[in-house]
């Protein structure tokens, strides 16, 4: 099966306009069992309440029945279960949890779409892709600004992107490279499967349920056609100066050499989004002066130091190296820093009555995860400050375990010698 997917990827990579007419049959028993094997059994269950272990008890029979229903097209996806998770701004993000059998089918579709589209996605796309991620996106922006002539940044975010993907446009984009009617039928079935919230069914006329197995791939295909291809084939050709685009899911940053071209792009971007049923989040989208000459230009106009912009939890700001030369640096964004601090504080207080050895062990796992993401060049001071805040919360929490004070500060420091907290470390170099 993997050999066939590799062959599809080769055709997609070497053909100018590949069209795939027969790929639906790849969703057979072998692929379905492989998808079952790869799925994380600890994830939340859908409306059917079926877990991976329960489905696997009669795996051969279940898979055979599933594939037969796919073949005769009697298969019908179940609605996704709507749940909410908190966002940094205090609001809640809706997620759609598919039933277990739907997760299997969605992963199979994702594999096929991945073989077709991964070779065709542009290098400026970093979200939900193999061997690419947040750090690579941050590094790309750093290098473009450091070594190029970029002087203006358009930082944009799409309002409710996953909830407003237009189904008809989505299908048109897919039909550009896929003319297998059966696969298109299945994808449309999922787009229209609906959601179940508090026992009430709601149809889905637009959007792709965030949290589903297939949703990130569909989102990338949508952004590929709406944004990145447009930037490459239209925007770049109209520009006289340097420009670049870095995209991660619904978040993206564009850089320009000239202000007039940045303003032109920003205006056309809004119109482009509206054409495909999308809207920029006004509070998170803006054009700023940022780059090698931003500070001296603003000083000459009697203005304050250059503005900053946030991307993927980091704040970019104009700075200097040891020789006095320009360098764009990054640090944990204030919003993400405070969000993480609150989360750690709540966890520490909720777990303060557990044995110290257990608390430190689990806390270190969390801290190392924090360092692995935020431990990038120039951000060591910020992650060190984060550790100090965590230590303070831990000290206060330990002294609330009983009526009497459990530790003096010196005693607490001595205790940390026996149960040390993980030390900050820079894991990722941006240059």
Protein language model annotation of sequence segments:
Residues 33-92:
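Phosphate/adenylate-binding "loop-and-lid" substructures adjacent to NTP/NAD/dNTP-binding pockets
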Residues 125, 203-208, 327-329, 345-359, ...:
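Short, solvent-exposed helix-loop connector elements
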Residues 1-23, 30:
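Charged, compositionally biased N-terminal leader segments and the immediate start
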Residues 27-33, 79-81, 88, 191, ...:
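Core structural elements
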Residues 380-431:
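A terminal-accessory region detector
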Residues 192, 280-355:
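A conserved non-catalytic segment of reverse transcriptases
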Residues 244-248, 285-293, 363-366, 383-391, ...:
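A glycine-rich phosphate-binding loop feature that marks nucleotide/adenosyl-phosphate handling sites
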Residues 69-84, 88, 120-290:
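Conserved polymerase palm-domain catalytic core
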